[in-house]
C-alpha cells in the first residue's frame, strides 16, 4: 500500500512539530535572515512595491515581492537550512 504525497507531507510536518525540529529549523532560519539583513531588505522591497503600484492589495504585493525575497536569501543560509531538513528527513524516511 502506498501513501499519497499529501499524507506523507502531513506526517512529516506532524513529526517535525512533535519532535521539536520544526522550531529548531525555524529559529535557525529566522536568526540567519535577521543577521544578514534579509528582513530589512524585504521590508524595503515591500515599501517600494507599494509606492510604485500604489497598491495595498496583499495578494498582488506578495506575488511581486515573494520571488525577489526568495532570490535574495544567501546561499549559505539556504544550504544550511536545506542540510538541516535533509538530515531530519534521512532520520525518519527509509530511502532504500
Swiss-Prot record:
Protein name in UniProt: Transcription and mRNA export factor SUS1
Keyword hit for Cytoplasm: yes
InterPro entries listed in its UniProt record: TF_ENY2 (IPR018783), TF_EnY2_sf (IPR038212)
Alphabetically ordered keywords of this record: Activator, Chromatin regulator, Cytoplasm, Isopeptide bond, mRNA transport, Nucleus, Protein transport, Transcription, Transcription regulation, Translocation, Transport, Ubl conjugation
Family the UniProt entry places it in: Belongs to the ENY2 family.
Keyword Acyltransferase: no
Any one Gene Ontology molecular-function term assigned to this protein's record: transcription coactivator activity
Covalent link location (Glycyl lysine isopeptide (Lys-Gly) (interchain with G-Cter in ubiquitin)): 68
Gene3D superfamilies: 1.10.246.140
Major localisation: nucleus
Regions that span the bilayer: none
Cellular location(s): Nucleus, Nucleoplasm; Cytoplasm, P-body
Subunit structure: Component of the nuclear pore complex (NPC)-associated TREX-2 complex (transcription and export complex 2), composed of at least SUS1, SAC3, THP1, SEM1, and CDC31. TREX-2 contains 2 SUS1 chains. The TREX-2 complex interacts with the nucleoporin NUP1. Component of the 1.8 MDa SAGA transcription coactivator-HAT complex. SAGA is built of 5 distinct domains with specialized functions. Within the SAGA complex, SUS1, SGF11, SGF73 and UBP8 form an additional subcomplex of SAGA called the DUB module (deubiquitination module). Interacts directly with THP1, SAC3, SGF11, and with the RNA polymerase II.
Organism of origin: Saccharomyces cerevisiae (strain YJM789) (Baker's yeast)
Pfam families: EnY2
GO cellular component, one term: SAGA complex
GO biological process terms on file: chromatin organization; mRNA export from nucleus; protein transport; transcription elongation by RNA polymerase II
Function (record text): Involved in mRNA export coupled transcription activation by association with both the TREX-2 and the SAGA complexes. At the promoters, SAGA is required for recruitment of the basal transcription machinery. It influences RNA polymerase II transcriptional activity through different activities such as TBP interaction and promoter selectivity, interaction with transcription activators, and chromatin modification through histone acetylation and deubiquitination.
Amino acid at each position: 500500500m502506498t501513501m499519497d504525497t499529501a499524507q506523507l507531507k502531513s506526517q512529516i510536518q506532524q513529526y517535525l512539530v512533535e519532535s521539536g525540529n520544526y522550531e529548531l529549523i525555524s529559529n535557525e532560519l529566522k536568526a540567519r535572515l535577521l543577521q544578514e539583513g534579509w528582513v530589512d531588505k524585504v521590508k524595503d522591497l515591500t515599501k517600494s512595491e507599494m509606492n510604485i503600484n500604489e497598491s495595498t492589495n496583499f495578494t498582488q504585493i506578495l506575488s511581486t515581492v515573494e520571488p525577489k525575497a526568495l532570490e535574495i536569501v544567501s546561499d549559505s543560509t539556504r544550504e544550511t537550512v536545506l542540510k538541516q531538513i535533509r538530515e531530519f528527513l534521512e532520520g525518519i524516511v527509509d530511502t532504500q
